[in-house]
């Protein structure tokens, strides 16, 4: 955290109740300013754990122990969220949910290069992380157990934003609603050709409001997905605002073949 002024308050996305802690779990927070460590567990609390920094400066917060969740109850703001500049490690806390963990953290610049393999919920994890230079290195993240990516990157609209998700295993994800919604930055050009979608995954508004890609982008994506024998079935997906290449009102032959294969699996593509 980069604290600009004396007596600045910040809050962590942690509450002292059973939504964050299972029985027997607790964490110890080192605030990085020489103050006493704070122990947090399920004590029935209903507010976010906060701290006041008496002096301006850069502080590293360390959290040890165990908890099942780091995140917020919906898309709510917490004190000092824009002052968070980097997350160096997710540790070994046993976290399963990062729901809205970094919501509206406009100053966030970097995240760990590995994700805990216990994580299943990434709902809104980086929603409105819209700093101009924000482009997290998530290329090696193991997301194979994740089921919820709803709004994961929504409104990540910074000019540099274009995370490498090319090797992500999203085969267990059931919710991709607004996943890339409003990712309107100049660099945005996601490579998803290796993805295997789960049968029936909800992709409503997956790209709504995002930067329009060249028609070749959708051509290549459809051909790659159709060639994947493990690709799921019964999927309704709206690629809007993106379109595939058309010549005299018809898709290219390879794209037409891909559409036929996917539609044969029960896909509805718009």
Pin down the residues of each PLM region.
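Negatively charged
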Residues: 1-270
